[in-house]
Amino acid sequence: MRNYLYTIIFAWLFCSQAYAQSIPPLSLPSIFSDHMVLQQNSKVKFWGWTNPRTTVRIIPSWGQDTIIVKADNRARFEVELQTPPTSKKNYQIEVKIKDRDLIIKDVLIGEVWLCSGQSNMEWNSAKGIQDVKDELPHANNSEIRF
C-alpha cells in the first residue's frame, strides 16, 4: 500500500511539472497596462519576463513590423519601440509567446509629462484657480490622462 501511494504521488508530481513547463509564463511590469501613454517620436524601452531563451514577438499596432526578441538566461527580454508622432488614434501592443499572448489596449501616443515635488503635487484646484467650479464641468477631454 505504501509503495502504491508513493507511486501515485510521484506520478502526480511528474505530470504537474510537465504541464507547468508546457505553459510558459509571460508577464510585463505594471507600468505597461491598458490606457497608458507613450512619448511620441521616441524609442521607448519595453521589457518583460518569460521562460529563459523563449522567443517573444512584440507587435505594436502603429507599425507594420513584428519585433522578435529572445529572453535571456535570466528570463528577461527587452526591446526599444519606435513610437510615431502624436495622434488621436488608440493603439494596442500585442506580446506573444507560443500559444499565449498579452494585449495592452487603448494606448495613446503623445506628450508624457512627469510631475514631481512634494509641495507642487499637494496643491489642488481649490487653492487659487479662479472659477474652478464653473470650469470643472467642461473639463471632459478624454485625451488627457492622469
Features from the language model and the residues they span:
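Bacterial Sec-dependent N-terminal signal peptides
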Residues: 1-23
